[in-house]
Structure formats: structure tokens, C-alpha cells
């Protein structure tokens, strides 16, 4: 596509699911976008298997972007990403894995990538509702454009994966990026526990603890010495404004 893309292109973009007839086009696009060679079975799966959410963005009939994702139980997360969610979440908790997200070069920076990502979120809210707690993906450590895209949309780097990719026989490093949704969160670290404890202590009045201890001691003493009259006026006083 050589013609200039108008700034209003997004208003002419339509969304539809990929189908078997799109295989050749999708192969060509993925060859342009990604350095990884996918087997033919992968293209058949993402265009035919209902377990994949495979959405195309089209402009005047041509595919100019697509997203492929799979919503699955947390038990099916690969070992290297097994700690994406805290162990407190049940085994039937779901996650969404983005296998692919790409936009034709001429149509980048027109909001199409964001539209596709938001469409995935809408799909999750409709099908998985609040059972899906995270959206995650893998990216080459050298793919700064993709990294900036996801970081600008609140994805956080979760893991560094050395030698994760094999590209034309050369091993390349990758990152796992995660966006937590619907209350999802990773396992707590020691720092998280310290911060939580600090937050809890910060909500306590610094003088409320000794004041409570004094009151409890006074009550206990009165129960043993009923003849004793202990006046708070002559005792210890604590300011409530400390």
C-alpha cells in the first residue's frame, strides 16, 4: 500500500474476525512484522480454532492490523511465567496471552494498535468477565517500539528471559510484560509485605496504643482492688493530638 494514509484513517477502519481465507495475507504480514517464522499449522489455528481471539483491522477492505490472543486457565501458563499471578488465586482463574499484535507500517501511529488492544479487553470483559486477572505477552528485548507501546498502556516488565527466542538459528533474549486487571496481582515480595505493614502502622495514632494500655491496666487494677479509686485526673494523660 503506497498511497498516503490520511490522518482520519482510523474512522474508516473496521474490525472483523480472521478466517481461513486470510491465511495467505496473514502469512505475508507476519513475515513483514516479525523475525520469527511460524509453521503453517499456526496460521491454520489462529484463523480457524475458536480458542483464539483473532481480530483483523481492515481499511477499505485490506487487513492493516491484527491481534491474536488466547484466554486460558492459569494452570496452562508456561513454566517461565508461572508466577505471573499470586498463588492465592484459584486454579480456574484465567489469563489472556497475546500471541501477536501488529500494524502495517504506513498505518502505525494512527491508533489502530490501541483499538485492537482495547477490543481484546472488551472481549475479555464479555466472555471471561472478572475471572481474567492478567494480560501478558513476550517481546524481544531489542524491540523498543513494541516495548514503548505496551509501557505507555500500563503493561509492566515482569521477567527477563535470556535466550528465549531462536531467530534464524540465533538465540535472542526476551521480556515478559503483564497488565493486571480485575484485581489481579503477582506474588508479594518482601518489600510488598514491609510496605503493607508500614501502611497499616501509619493508620494508627502514635499515642493511641499507650493510652489503650493505660486504660486496660486501670480497669484490671479496679477489678482486683474495688476499694481503690483511681482518678484519671491525677494519673497519666495523653494528648489526642500528638
UniProtKB/Swiss-Prot annotation:
It is a peripheral membrane protein. Acetylated: autoacetylation is required for optimal acetyltransferase activity. Substrate binds at residues 38, 99, 165. Coiled coil: none annotated. It is found in: Golgi apparatus membrane. Residues 1-192, 237-242 are cytoplasmic. The active site is at 97, 138. Residues 162-173 are annotated as: Required for homodimerization. Residues 193-236 dip into the membrane without crossing it. CDD domains: NAT_SF (cd04301). Its EC number is 2.3.1.259, 2.3.1.48. GO terms for cellular component: Golgi membrane. It catalyses: N-terminal L-methionyl-[transmembrane protein] + acetyl-CoA = N-terminal N(alpha)-acetyl-L-methionyl-[transmembrane protein] + CoA + H(+); L-lysyl-[protein] + acetyl-CoA = N(6)-acetyl-L-lysyl-[protein] + CoA + H(+). This is N-alpha-acetyltransferase 60. It comes from Bos taurus (Bovine).
Amino acid at each position: 500500500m503506497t498511497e498516503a494514509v490520511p490522518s482520519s484513517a482510523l474512522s474508516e477502519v473496521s474490525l472483523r474476525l480472521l478466517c481461513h481465507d486470510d491465511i495467505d495475507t496473514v502469512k505475508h504480514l507476519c513475515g513483514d512484522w516479525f523475525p520469527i517464522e511460524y509453521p503453517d499449522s499456526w496460521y491454520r489455528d489462529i484463523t480457524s480454532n475458536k480458542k483464539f481471539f483473532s481480530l483483523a483491522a481492515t481499511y477499505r477492505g485490506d487487513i492493516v492490523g491484527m491481534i491474536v490472543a488466547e484466554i486460558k486457565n492459569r494452570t496452562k501458563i508456561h513454566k517461565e511465567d508461572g508466577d505471573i499471578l499470586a498463588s492465592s488465586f484459584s486454579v480456574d482463574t484465567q489469563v489472556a496471552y497475546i500471541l501477536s499484535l501488529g500494524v502495517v507500517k504506513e498505518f502505525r501511529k494512527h491508533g489502530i494498535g490501541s483499538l485492537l488492544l482495547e477490543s481484546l479487553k472488551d472481549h475479555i470483559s464479555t466472555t471471561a468477565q472478572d475471572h481474567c486477572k492478567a494480560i501478558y505477552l513476550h517481546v524481544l528485548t531489542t524491540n523498543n517500539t513494541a516495548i514503548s507501546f505496551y509501557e505507555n498502556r500500563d503493561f509492566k516488565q515482569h521477567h527477563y528471559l535470556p535466550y528465549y527466542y531462536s531467530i534464524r538459528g540465533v538465540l535472542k533474549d526476551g521480556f515478559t510484560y503483564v497488565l493486571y486487571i480485575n484485581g489481579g496481582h503477582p506474588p508479594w515480595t518482601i518489600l510488598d509485605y514491609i510496605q503493607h505493614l508500614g501502611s497499616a502502622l501509619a493508620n494508627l495514632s502514635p499515642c493511641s496504643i499507650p493510652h489503650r494500655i493505660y486504660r486496660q491496666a486501670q480497669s484490671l487494677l479496679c477489678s482486683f482492688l474495688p476499694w481503690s479509686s483511681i482518678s484519671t485526673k491525677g494519673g497519666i494523660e495523653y494528648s489526642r493530638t500528638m
